[in-house]
């Protein structure tokens, strides 16, 4: 395959890199507030053997970032390519915006049949590449504090291995970590990769191990029936030492991410509220435990065990799972039942509606709790159309940006744009755009 040189510029310094194979050609825009850096593969021992790009989103009006939320894809070309849109996800942006954090999505350019461990084990060079990207993106975005702020890590499959590995390598930097369908190898794990030492500092990091029930939780056979067998030793190694770790299972899914974001984002929200320091450069705050809830492990797989305040729990810590708050405990119970976590909050109203001829464009933010399902457009006081007109999502609740297997918007990105083909020429119509979240609630 022909490869062409590409000139990239970071902080005014031109460097020569090589373009990606066709499957990784990235057409997703990276203009402010988005920023991107890409590194070519290295031939040096111990460094990353695959090319990688990192896309960063910075919320408007933030003078100094408090942290960075990292959305890490899994293994294989399809999952790796999904990382190209991760920083554009409006729902994850809502979480980052609330806590004055950036949102970062890597794309490791792993060939389909190549060894995923060569990037998803951060000891194989991806940790160093990540740290370099934070420095370079901090410079190009005008936020040099990016290289020292805490991280909130989300990872799917191989990304779960990566995020868990970063908890073990850099516990002082990780505010919280959500591991979907994957975890790194520790003593007792069946994985063949080199095991990690569980450092005491890692036990202070809130972690959630999340799976689909058909990944060996209640359904033991099938392609992904062995996933829980790899995750369970990690969970037990942590919880037996008193770690702040929980586990949850989607009753509707296997390896696809499904509706996990409706628990992951509230969980991450609670953890960031407990952990992020107000002053950049200060250490992460330790979780006091006064607001924590626990769930007895016996029967957790089907949601039969009820959460209870940790302060009144009389059982062994190692025989329970940890949750950061009563609100998250309530959401956990509903998620374990059917993933239909309720929401009573209205989404933010759209802004910046422009009408040029019969073309409407606007901007909108997602609801923190339930994301953005779509829009209702009114013309002259009456409903004109509901967008999307035919909502589809085979992996979970229908959302405006659509949803990939790996929890990112599909390509091409869906624009906030509508052409009113029935507009009367020469007449000035009055339009209104209303946001609708995935709980069905409308903006005012």
Residues covered by each model-derived region:
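Recognizes extended acidic, P/S/T-rich segments that occur
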Residues: 374-426
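Alpha/beta-hydrolase active-site loop
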Residues: 118-145
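Pro/Thr/Ser/Gly-rich low-complexity, intrinsically disordered linker/stalk tracts
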Residues: 333-371, 425, 439-444
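Beta-strand-rich modules
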Residues: 420-441
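The feature captures the conserved acid-bearing segment of alpha/beta-hydrolase catalytic domains
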Residues: 175-262
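Alpha/beta-hydrolase-fold serine-hydrolase catalytic core, especially in secreted/extracellular enzymes
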Residues: 241-243, 251-351
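Short substrate-entry loop that stabilizes the transition state in hydrolases
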Residues: 62-114, 186-187, 217-219
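A domain-start/cap signature at the N-terminus of enzymes
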Residues: 18-68, 99, 151-166, 170, ...
